[in-house]
């Protein structure tokens, strides 16, 4: 469950300082003659050397969260960076528990120069750094051209991303967090099953439930989700609300603005979500399942849709599935045909701490990560796609067909991200409790759509009162 589980839990964890200990794989990737002789590395070396940059401090210390993408990309990109900048040494700490590992180091003043870690990580480290204004302003990096493309980096990144709370957490137009990849999220389905039955993916909520009635006749549920990890529902709820209430209103939601979900249109979305459970469209047993169980059931054609992202293909590579199963991804339903459909994106992130000892080399490393060579390497080693406009075409034929095809959802809907603004220091609200942790109650009929919506609005009121 690579990305979405803790998306809505970050706020709850942000105030928790975990001074956990652990061991990270630590290495210094030295440039080898073999790496330097490779065509890709030679190209990167030539590109980077054009600027003939030198640095007073040639040692770069980076900390990387090791998630579903693994470590191979990082091992190789470090070799290529060192080859491109002779004399530079990169020391890496990489671990699934990197937040717990580097938190005590940061407290002790041993701050990494560069971090690859998300603001929704369960340790709450990056969220805490945002609250404490402990991240460096990276706006100058994105105003500059890239290493291998003179276009300013800000114009190379997918539209709307740098302006979002994921990259500009204070809403002041300054970039403090850099985007890594932007994986599309939505409703995963089996393209083969739809083709065999002549079904079209639904556009409106009416279409969605009509399709559910057809599926019932074949003994297939319309919908399932990762029951005990309800945060996955974000890839359906937020785009649906954006379509119904307007994308600008989602900025108000993200900043906990009272009344931002009080409209009739917003309520209709909550009612449609609740209808999945109340009217028998939810796969039996869903609320008790974990992510792998529910995803496997969907892949066995027990349900038409499950909310997830394009990483599901890799995550479920060894899972059983229906014969001929082919991954597809479609947008959340809209209230009325003609409304803008949105594609929620799960964004992984890079940071440079405000008190990094070698910020200039860290910034150059960040620029190096956005080169075409790096983008293709990430696709090759991790089956991932950078958050750049041209990245999907750069990696065609490198990433799997499933990932490439699911990225085509951007042709169907408009890109959006959703990230909560920094919670006021004075607030004790756990926003996840009101938004997604009540999902099982809603689906079981123990909470109405109105109560669900009103509970979120009450949380917003409490947050506003604490400011």
Predicted regions and their residues:
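Glycine-centered hinge/linker elements that transmit conformational signals in sensory
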Residues: 214-215, 255-287
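Extracytoplasmic/periplasmic substrate-recognition and gating elements
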Residues: 79, 83, 89, 107-108, ...
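Extracytoplasmic/periplasmic solute-binding protein
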Residues: 49, 166-180, 185, 209-258, ...
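Hinge/lid segment of periplasmic solute-binding proteins
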Residues: 48-50, 123-184, 209, 236, ...
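Short, well-ordered beta-strand elements
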Residues: 55-67, 88-93, 114, 176, ...
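Extracytoplasmic "Venus flytrap"/periplasmic binding protein-like
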Residues: 80-160, 192, 196-200, 301-305
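C-terminal capping/gating helix-and-loop segments adjacent to ligand/active sites or protein-protein/ligand interfaces
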Residues: 254, 343-344, 384-387, 392, ...
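Short, solvent-exposed loop/beta-turn-alpha elements that line the ligand-binding surface or hinge
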Residues: 137-157, 244-268, 318-322, 331-342, ...
């Amino acid at each position: 469950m690579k990305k979405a589980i803790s998306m809505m839990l970050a706020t709850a964890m942000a105030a928790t300082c975990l001074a956990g200990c652990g061991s990270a794989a630590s290495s210094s990737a030295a440039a080898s003659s073999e790496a330097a002789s490779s065509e890709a590395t030679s190209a990167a070396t030539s590109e980077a050397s054009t600027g003939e940059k030198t640095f007073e401090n040639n040692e770069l210390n980076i900390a990387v969260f090791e998630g579903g993408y693994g470590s191979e990309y990082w091992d190789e990109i470090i070799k290529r960076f060192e080859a491109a900048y002779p004399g530079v040494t990169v020391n890496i700490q990489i671990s699934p528990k990197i937040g717990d590992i580097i938190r005590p180091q940061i407290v002790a003043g041993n701050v990494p120069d560069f971090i690859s870690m998300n603001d929704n990580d369960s340790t709450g480290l990056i969220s805490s750094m945002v609250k404490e204004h402990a991240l460096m302003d990276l706006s100058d990096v994105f105003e500059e051209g890239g290493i291998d493309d003179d276009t300013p980096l800000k114009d190379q990144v997918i539209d709307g991303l740098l302006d979002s709370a994921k990259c500009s957490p204070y809403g002041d137009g300054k970039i403090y967090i850099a985007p890594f990849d932007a994986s599309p999220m939505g409703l995963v389905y089996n393209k083969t099953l739809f083709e065999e039955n002549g079904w079209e993916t639904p556009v409106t909520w009416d279409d969605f439930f009509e399709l559910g009635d057809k599926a019932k006749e074949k003994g297939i549920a319309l919908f399932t989700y990762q029951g005990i990890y309800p945060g996955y529902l974000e890839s359906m709820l937020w785009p649906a609300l954006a379509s119904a209430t307007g994308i600008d209103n989602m900025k108000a939601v993200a900043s906990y603005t009272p009344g931002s979900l009080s409209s009739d249109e917003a309520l209709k979305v909550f009612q449609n979500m609740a209808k999945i459970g109340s009217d028998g469209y939810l796969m039996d047993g869903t609320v008790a399942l974990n992510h792998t169980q529910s995803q496997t059931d969907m892949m066995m054609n027990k349900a038409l849709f499950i909310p997830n992202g394009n990483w599901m293909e890799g995550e479920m590579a060894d899972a059983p599935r229906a014969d001929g199963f082919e991954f597809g991804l479609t947008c959340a339903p809209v209230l009325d045909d003609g409304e803008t459909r949105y594609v929620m994106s799960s964004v992984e992130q890079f940071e440079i701490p405000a008190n990094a000892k070698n910020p200039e080399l860290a910034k150059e490393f960040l620029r190096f990560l956005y080169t075409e060579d790096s983008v293709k390497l990430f696709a090759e080693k991790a089956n991932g796609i950078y958050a750049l406009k041209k990245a999907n075409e750069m990696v065609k034929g490198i990433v799997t067909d499933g990932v490439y095809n699911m990225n085509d959802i951007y042709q169907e809907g408009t890109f959006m991200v959703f990230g909560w603004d920094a919670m006021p220091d004075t607030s004790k609200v756990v926003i996840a409790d009101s938004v997604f942790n009540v999902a099982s109650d809603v689906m079981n009929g123990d909470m109405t759509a109105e109560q669900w919506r009103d509970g979120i609005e009450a949380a917003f009121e409490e947050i506003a009162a604490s400011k």
